[in-house]
């Protein structure tokens, strides 16, 4: 006879299952954020312009 795992029905089992689901969702959200950082920066307008680098360059007083 095969033993089949029973679903978690206790409060402790339900809390553990909920914590795992929340953790997986958070990890998935983080992975999506990391994977699409270049796209998000472009959409938000946060990309660095090459011409702005000259303005911010340090020039010593001579």
Curated annotation (Swiss-Prot):
GO cellular component, one term: chloroplast outer membrane
The entry's keywords: Chloroplast, Membrane, Plastid, Plastid outer membrane, Transmembrane, Transmembrane helix
Segments in the Chloroplast intermembrane topological domain: 1-17
Membrane-side (Cytoplasmic) residue stretches: 41-62
This protein's name: 6.7 kDa chloroplast outer envelope membrane protein
Annotated membrane topology: Single-pass membrane protein
Major localization listed first in the record, in broad terms: plastid
Protein location: Plastid, Chloroplast outer membrane
Translocase recorded as keyword: no
Transmembrane helix keyword on record: yes
TM helices/strands, residue ranges: 18-40
Tree of life domain: Eukaryota
């Amino acid at each position: 006879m095969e033993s089949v795992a029973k679903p978690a029905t206790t409060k402790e089992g339900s809390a553990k299952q909920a914590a795992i689901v929340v953790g997986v969702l958070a990890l998935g959200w983080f992975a999506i954020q990391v994977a699409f950082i270049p796209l998000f920066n472009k959409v938000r307008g946060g990309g660095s312009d090459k011409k702005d680098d000259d303005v911010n360059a340090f020039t010593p007083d001579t």
